[in-house]
Every structure is written in C-alpha cells, then in structure tokens.
Swiss-Prot record:
Reaction it catalyzes: L-aspartate(89)-[ribosomal protein uS12]-hydrogen + (sulfur carrier)-SH + AH2 + 2 S-adenosyl-L-methionine = 3-methylsulfanyl-L-aspartate(89)-[ribosomal protein uS12]-hydrogen + (sulfur carrier)-H + 5'-deoxyadenosine + L-methionine + A + S-adenosyl-L-homocysteine + 2 H(+)
Family annotation (InterPro entries): Elp3/MiaA/NifB-like_rSAM, Methylthiotransferase, Methylthiotransferase_CS, Methylthiotransferase_N, Methylthiotransferase_N_sf, NA-bd_OB-fold, Ribosomal_uS12_MeSTrfase_RimO, rSAM
Keyword Metal-binding: yes
Functional description taken from the UniProt entry: Catalyzes the methylthiolation of an aspartic acid residue of ribosomal protein uS12.
Domain MTTase N-terminal: 7-117
CDD domains reported for this sequence: Radical_SAM
Residue ranges constituting the TRAM domain according to the UniProt record: 374-440
Free-text remark on how the cofactor is bound: Binds 2 [4Fe-4S] clusters. One cluster is coordinated with 3 cysteines and an exchangeable S-adenosyl-L-methionine.
Required cofactor(s): [4Fe-4S] cluster
Organism classification: Bacteria, Pseudomonadati, Pseudomonadota, Alphaproteobacteria, Hyphomicrobiales
Protein's recorded name: Ribosomal protein uS12 methylthiotransferase RimO
UniProt GO MF annotations: 4 iron, 4 sulfur cluster binding; aspartic acid methylthiotransferase activity; metal ion binding; protein methylthiotransferase activity
Domain Radical SAM core stretches: 134-371
Subcellular localization, as worded in the UniProt entry: Cytoplasm
Organism: Rhodopseudomonas palustris (strain HaA2)
C-alpha cells in the first residue's frame, strides 16, 4: 500500500532576525510533525506568511506577500508582528485562514492542523536536535529574550511583542551548545534589548553543567564565550554595564563587535525620541572602549528627519559621527508608525529634507568607513567563509555581521570550505569591503 504524501507548506519569513528565529521555531515544529516544506506557493497545501509590522513600508511588503500567497495558493495563515493588529490584513484579505501575532507558535500550529492535518510517519518525525534553521549551517541567530521595557517614542515593538521576557541562562546555553555541536561557527546574539537581558528575572540563577549561571548580560556573554564559537552581540542598548563586556573582547571570549542602536546624537532629538541623551559621555565611553580593545568594531543605526530635527541637530549628528568613527552604519528616514507617540510631535520634516539629510549622512559614513578600512591594509585578519566563487571566496571579518555589514573577498591557492575560518592578509580596501589573500600559501 502506497504511503500517503506528506502535506506541504510554503513559508515566507519577513522582517528582522528575531522574526527569522520565530520562523525557525514554527518550521521545526512542523517538520517534527511530518510536514514538508514546498519551494513554491502553488505546489503547497497552504502558505504561512510571517509578517513585519514595524514600519508602514514593512506593512506594505507584508501585505504584498500575503496577496501573492493568496493569488498563487488561496490557503494562507498569517502570523508575526503585523498580525498583532489584524484589522488591516482582514480588510485587505478577508479570506485568510488565520491571523496571529508574534511568538504565537501554538496558534499557528493549531491553524495548520485545522487546514491540513498532519500524517504521522515515524520516518518523517526526525528533526535535528538543534531544530530547523533558515540560515547557512555555519552561523545561527540565538534569541535570548522577547519584548522590550523601553518606550521610545517612535517604536511600537512593546505593543507588538510585549515587555521584556528573558529566557533562563541555562536554556540559552543549552541551545547554543547544541548549535555549536551541529557545526555552527558563529552565534549571533539577538533580542529587542540584549543588554537588558535578565532584568525581568531579577538575574535569577539556573543550573548549567557543574555550576549556576545568572541571567545577566555579562554572565551570559562570558559563558557563551567558552563554547568555542564566534559570539557576536547585537541590539545592545548602551547601559553603563555594557562597559564590562569590553574585557571579554580583549580576552578573545566574544568578538570585538558591538551593535548599538544610538538612533541620533543631538540631545534635543534624543529627548524627543525618549532615548538616553548623554551622547557626550557616549563619546568618552567609545574612546575608552577602543583604548581597551583597539580592534573593536561599532555598528549602529540612526534615524534622520525625526519630528523636530533641525538642521543644527543634523549637523551635530554629522560632527558626532566624525568623532565617534562608527564602523558600520544603517540609516533610516523617519516614517510615522501607527500607534507611535512620535506621530503627535510638532515639527514634522518634509520628505525632500529627509532624503537630502539621508544622502549627506550616508556620504559622510562612506568616507568614515573607507578611512577605517584603509587602516587594515597590510594586516592579517581572521575571516569566516560564506560563499565560494569560481575565482574568489566571499567571507567576513570579526568586524562584519552577515547580511548587514561588509564582506572580505579572498583568493587562495588551496580549496576553501564554507564555514571555514582562515587567516588572510588584507591587500586593499574600498569604501565598505576588503580584499585579500589567504595567508600561508
């Protein structure tokens, strides 16, 4: 008797790495129940769309993805941040099977079961212990908490994902250890507010191996640094205790890399954003960090054209960047977000001014990046290989996160492998990328 075909699901994952982790968890559960993944909507039994709802542009992308799934398949389950406020989805696509908010894994699975029940097959119920991942095998996102306790005026993340909810240190470390055992060479630590990790748990201890570990930013970073993989810290809010992690970087326990979303530099704009406004002290801290760890790379994001931002505020930001010398920068033109307090602020900046300031900011940052990368010419850097091409390999240095930062293009006399970490001599630099040769050959 022929075995019935396993039900197939097509999956669309939109938004940030935190949403990608949500997608991985849903897919892991589905694969454990015997569902298969389809590459095309029209060949699937149903489609799941994990949406982003942070900016209006992201909502439009999510709606477009839902529309494509409805047109190609017709059976669509919607989840993710945009699903936390379902009215817009319901109005545009009343025929979707289910709409849920972020992290509602059980609700998504219930909707799948109703639409297409699983076929139990013990030969299919095999899932790697570390779960299903959507990233390449050599790196993985490690989500340590959900939600956020901050109330920045431009942000609705707490409304979508709730207040801070940290995982226990032991739970995080168990997942990290499984990932490393499965061949992961780089752990990218993510959350909405990584440096606030454990505040909600009152830094409670949990048993890990022969000891107890506190649910605290520095303690978790120290333990992750013992697993033998690169550890990269993202979304680090600049609380004073962040200074402590620089020592782990100088010891080689975690990568000399900090992703800190400063958002602006002008004290007046930061006050309107409800962000820490002591950026003069931040410059002093950056200088101390780099004195302690000269290889430190800083990534940040900034918003231009925020309501109330004057030309003087913007010039202040440019001057601050020149002094801070941020290595990697992402910039956004301010967009009103439904439900954000910043919508009610006076002094809305015209779109053409936003665009002009964004252009100037990116030009300034390009010059800073080129200047800093030029200093690396002639040095030797450790590079993790991401892709192998016909003549060159593409990788990243310790200063580069996947997808968002620069690349290092390498030539080598010997074959290289994806995920391999090699030492390379840097031969030249351009504005955002490095070029070099694998050392020793």
């Amino acid at each position: 008797m022929q075995q019935a075909a396993a039900p197939k699901i097509s999956f669309v994952s939109l938004g940030c790495p935190k949403a990608l982790v949500d997608s991985e968890r849903i897919i892991t559960r589905l694969r454990a129940e015997g569902y298969e993944l389809a590459r095309q909507h029209d060949g699937a039994d149903l489609v799941i769309v994990n949406t982003c709802g942070f900016l209006d542009s992201a909502k439009q992308e999510s709606l477009a993805a839902i529309g494509e799934a409805m047109a190609a398949n017709g059976k669509v389950i919607v989840t993710g941040c945009m699903g936390a406020e379902p009215e817009q989805i319901e109005a545009a696509y009343p025929g979707v099977l289910s709409i849920t908010g972020p992290q509602q894994y059980e609700s998504v699975l219930d909707a799948v079961h109703r639409a297409k029940p699983a076929l139990h097959n013990p030969h299919l119920d095999l899932v790697p212990e570390q779960g299903i991942r959507l990233t390449p095998r050599h790196y993985a996102y490690l989500k340590i908490s959900e939600g956020c306790n901050n109330r920045c005026s431009f942000c609705i993340i707490p409304k979508l994902r709730g207040d801070l909810a940290s995982r226990s240190a032991a739970d995080v470390l168990r997942e990290a250890e499984k990932l490393v055992a499965a061949g992961v060479k780089e752990l990218l630590v993510i959350s909405q507010d990584t440096s606030a990790y454990g505040v909600d748990l009152k830094y409670a201890e949990s048993p890990w191996k022969d000891r107890s570990v506190r649910a605290k930013f520095i303690d978790l970073a120290r333990e992750l640094g013992e697993l033998g993989a690169w550890v990269r810290l993202h979304y680090v809010y600049p609380y004073p205790h962040v200074d402590e992690v620089i020592g782990l970087m100088t010891e080689g326990k975690v990568l000399p890399y900090l992703d800190i979303p400063f958002q602006h530099a002008s004290p007046d704009v930061l006050k309107l954003m409800k962000r820490p406004a002591a950026q003069d002290k931040t410059l002093e801290r950056i200088k101390r960090w780099r004195a302690q760890c000269p290889d430190l790379a800083l990534r940040s994001t900034f918003i231009v054209g925020f309501p109330g931002e004057t030309e003087r505020d913007f010039e202040f930001l440019l001057d601050w960047l020149d002094e801070a010398e941020i290595d990697r920068l992402g910039a956004f033109k301010y967009e009103p977000v439904a439900g954000a307090p910043s919508n009610a602020l006076e002094g809305q900046v015209p779109d053409e001014v936003k665009q002009e300031r964004w252009n100037r900011l990116m030009a300034r940052q390009q010059a800073i990046s080129a200047r800093r990368l030029k200093r690396k010419v002639g040095t030797r850097q450790q590079i993790i290989i991401d892709e192998i091409g016909p003549t060159v390999a593409k990788g990243r240095s310790k200063a580069d996160a996947p997808e968002i930062d620069g690349s290092v293009y390498l030539t080598s006399r010997r074959p290289l492998r994806v995920g391999e970490i090699v030492t390379a001599k840097i031969d030249r630099a351009d504005a955002y990328d490095l070029h070099g040769t694998v050392a020793g050959f």
